[in-house]
Swiss-Prot record:
GO terms for molecular function: GTP binding; ribosomal small subunit binding; rRNA binding. GTP binds at residues 120-127, 167-171, 236-239. It comes from Ailuropoda melanoleuca. Probable GTPase that plays a role in the mitochondrial ribosomal small subunit assembly. Specifically binds the 12S mitochondrial rRNA (12S mt-rRNA) to a 33 nucleotide section delineating the 3' terminal stem-loop region. May act as a chaperone that protects the 12S mt-rRNA on the 28S mitoribosomal subunit during ribosomal small subunit assembly. This is GTPase Era, mitochondrial. Residues 120-127 are annotated as: G1.
Length: 437
């Protein structure tokens, strides 16, 4: 252990440079590192705020055993075989994040790239899948609809391949957008992202018995209009199905019995289910209807089908490796240290809104306005954030604060925990609730 620790700290980061250590000094720092990594993270909470801290070294990311985005940019990232292979975090400083986004990509000799658009109905689990593929939670996730309000971008970089994930809002109709006074971005962003897509991932939550039997009209319309873009079907939460025969039926319906140009052979598998027809492909026209037939409910041009279990990370890993393998020869768009195009402030605001959607009843979270009044680095390298939550009614103030301030304190703690994993530093967050004047 001492030898490994000594090798791990042969280079000590000093401001924006590195200092070479001798064998004796390296062993001393290795011993300190070992004791620090054995320390348990401390957690201190207070009314309407939370503070999370842990052991600290020269870099805020070091006590997590991970490399920050700026470490990658400066060439200080940990090599393969370090404590973890998780992706870099996001810098807490907006100027550092902006610098990384515009920096020339550190491409290998034979780079490959793939732009992937995730499509699905609202609340289908697109952001959850994006976070799993990225290895970090950078997109907000909630059981309520319209958590993702505009197009967000995530980047996976491994070896020669770079996959750019476009996490789009759930596809909605113009009628619904007007009826609920939703942002125009919820209607337009999925269509805009399709114009530059190399691959479309259509996500269906098979645990939702109300929506799982067919692709939404908006998804079908999008697939039809951009039929030249290759697409795959991802069926999520298959472990929630008690009868696996239902999974076969759903597969046949959502693909119209055809995958990669070949008819699915399901008759033998479904033989134990009396009266269950074996679906066969039908001839289709250019729109979303069958020629001389009923409204189309599936898409017969999927190249592959992936079935994901909510409990298994291996399924997500298989999908990730498939996406990396589909990358085509071409220049990277981003430096390998980029995880997302979002600013640190946007990430924070989205995570706070996620918790509001999670904890507040009915339509109340949609009326909360967020205003960041402090964002700075503390004396010990921690991130200090203060945000005001503005609500339109006095009753909303009482609900959001909760009895003895428990609810707002719980929200602050949960947000701080998520942000610490994203920014790879300690986080002190204070939330205050004000009546909107």
């Amino acid at each position: 252990m001492a030898a490994a620790s000594g090798r791990a700290v042969t280079l000590l980061r000093v401001v924006f440079g590195v200092r070479q250590l001798g064998p004796t000094a390296a062993r001393e720092w290795g011993a300190r590192l070992s004791s620090l990594f054995d320390c348990q993270r401390r957690c201190v909470s207070c009314f309407a705020g939370a503070s999370f801290s842990g052991p600290r070294l020269a870099s805020a990311s070091r006590h997590h055993g991970q490399s920050s985005a700026m470490d990658c940019f400066l060439g200080l990232s940990q090599p393969d075989g370090s404590l973890t292979s998780r992706p870099p975090g996001v810098s807490m400083h907006r100027d550092e994040q902006d610098l990384l986004l515009v920096h020339r990509p550190d491409m290998p000799e034979n780079p490959r790239v793939l732009r992937v658009v995730l499509l699905g109905a609202p609340n289908a689990g697109k952001s959850t899948l994006s976070n799993q593929l990225l290895g970090r939670k950078v997109f907000p996730v909630s059981k309520k609809v319209h958590t993702t309000r505009c197009q967000a971008l995530g980047v996976i970089t491994e070896k020669e391949a770079q996959v750019i994930l476009l996490d789009t809002p759930g596809l909605i109709s113009p009628v619904k957008q007007k009826r609920h006074h939703l942002e125009l971005s919820l209607l337009e962003d999925p269509w805009k992202s399709m114009e530059s897509a190399d691959l479309v991932v259509v996500l269906v939550d098979v645990s939702d018995k109300w929506t799982r039997n067919q692709l939404s009209p908006q998804v079908l319309q999008c697939l039809t209009q951009f039929s030249q873009v290759p697409s795959i079907l991802v069926m999520n939460k298959v472990d929630c199905l008690k009868q696996k025969s239902v999974l076969l039926e759903l597969t046949a319906a959502l693909t119209e019995g055809v995958v990669n140009g070949k008819k699915l052979k399901m008759r033998q598998a479904l033989r134990s289910q009396p009266g269950t027809p074996c679906p066969s492909p039908a001839v289709k026209g250019p729109n979303t209807q069958s020629v001389g037939g009923p409204q189309r409910i599936g898409w017969p041009h999927f190249q592959e089908i992936f079935m994901l279990s909510a409990l298994s990370q291996e399924d997500v890993k298989t999908l990730k490796q498939y996406l990396l393998a589909q990358a085509r020869p071409g220049p990277w768009e981003f430096h390998s240290g980029v995880l997302t195009s979002q600013t640190p402030e946007e990430i924070c605001a989205n995570i706070i809104r996620e918790k509001l959607l999670e904890h507040l009843p009915q339509e109340m979270p949609y009326s909360v306005q967020q205003r960041t009044v402090m964002w700075e680095e503390g004396p010990s390298g921690e991130l200090v954030i203060e945000q005001k939550l503005l609500v339109p009614k006095k009753s909303h103030v009482r609900i959001l604060i909760g009895p003895k301030g428990h609810l707002i304190s719980q929200i602050a703690q949960e947000v701080s925990r998520d942000l610490m994993d994203i920014f790879l530093c300690d986080v002190r967050l204070r939330l205050s609730v004000k009546l909107l004047q």
